[in-house]
Curated annotation (Swiss-Prot):
Leader sequence segment: none
UniProt similarity note: Belongs to the aspartate/ornithine carbamoyltransferase superfamily. ATCase family.
Primary gene name: pyrB
Pathway: Pyrimidine metabolism; UMP biosynthesis via de novo pathway; (S)-dihydroorotate from bicarbonate: step 2/3
One GO CC term, this protein: cytosol
NCBIfam families: asp_carb_tr, PRK00856.1
Residue sites binding carbamoyl phosphate per the record: 68-69, 118, 148, 151, 277-278
Reactions that this protein is recorded to catalyse: carbamoyl phosphate + L-aspartate = N-carbamoyl-L-aspartate + phosphate + H(+)
Recorded GO MF terms: amino acid binding; aspartate carbamoyltransferase activity
Protein's GO biological process: 'de novo' pyrimidine nucleobase biosynthetic process; 'de novo' UMP biosynthetic process; amino acid metabolic process
Name the record gives this protein: Aspartate carbamoyltransferase catalytic subunit
Keywords, ordered alphabetically: Pyrimidine biosynthesis, Transferase
Length: 320
């Protein structure tokens, strides 16, 4: 998806859009994580605001349903003191047949400063970034199967928070990887940050073999895939993106690939368990694990606000 010149960066190598973790230099990833750390304390203040985006208009354009991502983006923008506009797609002109670019052109005429976009079509945020005015910034909140960069970044923040260093880590990503934009964003970021052992775990129908070309170890046996893992990232089954019988049943899937306390015992003693949500208990993870001592699923949500604040504040401060 990336052109020869990375469209996310200006000529000085500064971040002006966030479209994917693919192709982002380690220095940019580290800048985002370091900046997020400075925003964590804002959550604990009586007045949870900083003035960095005061006077800026942020438009949330969610063409797909979302709870955590949309809410945390709205909270993040408001804590940066931005004016936030949530476009109701079902009631907008897009529902009447208006093209994506016409929608963007009209919103740009309202002096938008930033678009946060979730879309079912891979590449939609790239298209918007290519056609919007130079002063307008675009953040990809998930596009098709392609990328979910802020989820990838908050996952990296979570890993760094608990593990301190990426070198030497063993990270297992388990579940429906073939349909997962989160998995792709995580793999690109983990690779750039120097994680030497990345594993993709799941049935053959849900794990693309070409991940091996990215240096990922593909495992179809759960026990092998999570053995001695320092980090386990569980993914839900994306039934809405599946066509045909890719799995025998949810029960059979849980038996083979659901994370239980017994299976977790195969991982490193201080392993952390992550999940981008929404969780399907009893399908990819049992409640004793999701709510247990190894789980950092709820802290991920908290960190997501700080990470999205970091992304928006950084790109808003850089010129195209």
């Amino acid at each position: 998806m990336l052109s020869r010149r990375n469209p996310q960066l200006n000529n000085h190598g500064e971040l002006i859009h966030l479209l994917s973790t693919e192709g982002l230099p380690r220095a940019v990833l580290t800048q985002i994580l370091d900046t997020a750390s400075t925003f964590l304390s804002v959550n604990d203040r009586d007045v949870k605001k900083v003035p960095l985006l005061r006077g800026k208009s942020v438009f949330n354009l969610f063409f797909e349903n979302s709870t955590r991502t949309r809410t945390t983006f709205e909270i993040a923008a408001k804590r940066l003191s931005a004016d936030v506009i949530n476009l109701d797609i079902a009631k907008s002109s897009a529902a009447k047949g208006e093209s994506l670019l016409d929608t963007i052109a009209n919103l740009s005429a309202m002096h938008a400063d930033m678009f946060v976009v979730r879309h079912s079509e891979s590449g939609a945020p790239y298209l918007i970034a290519e056609h919007c005015a130079p002063h307008v910034h675009v953040v990809n909140a998930g596009d098709g199967r392609h990328a979910h960069p802020t989820q990838g970044l908050l996952d990296m923040y979570t890993i760094r928070h608990y593990k301190k260093d990426f070198t030497g880590l063993r990270v297992a990503i388990v579940g429906d990887i073939v349909h997962s934009r989160v998995a792709r964003s995580d793999i690109h970021a983990l690779t750039t940050l120097g994680v030497p052992d990345i594993r993709a775990v799941g049935p053959k129908t849900l794990v693309p073999g070409d991940l091996r070309d990215m240096g990922v170890r593909v495992c179809h046996d759960m026990a092998e895939g999570i053995k001695d893992a320092d980090v386990i990232i569980m993914l839900r089954l994306q039934n809405e993106r599946m066509s045909g019988a890719m799995l025998p049943s949810a029960g059979e899937y849980f038996k083979s690939y659901g994370l239980t306390a017994d299976k977790l015992a195969l991982a490193a003693p201080d392993c952390i368990v992550m999940h981008p949500g929404p969780i399907n208990r009893g399908v990819e993870i049992e409640s004793t694990v999701a709510d247990g001592a190894h789980s950092v699923i709820l802290p991920q949500v908290t960190f997501g606000i700080a990470v999205r604040m970091a992304v928006m504040s950084i790109i808003a401060g850089n010129d195209a």
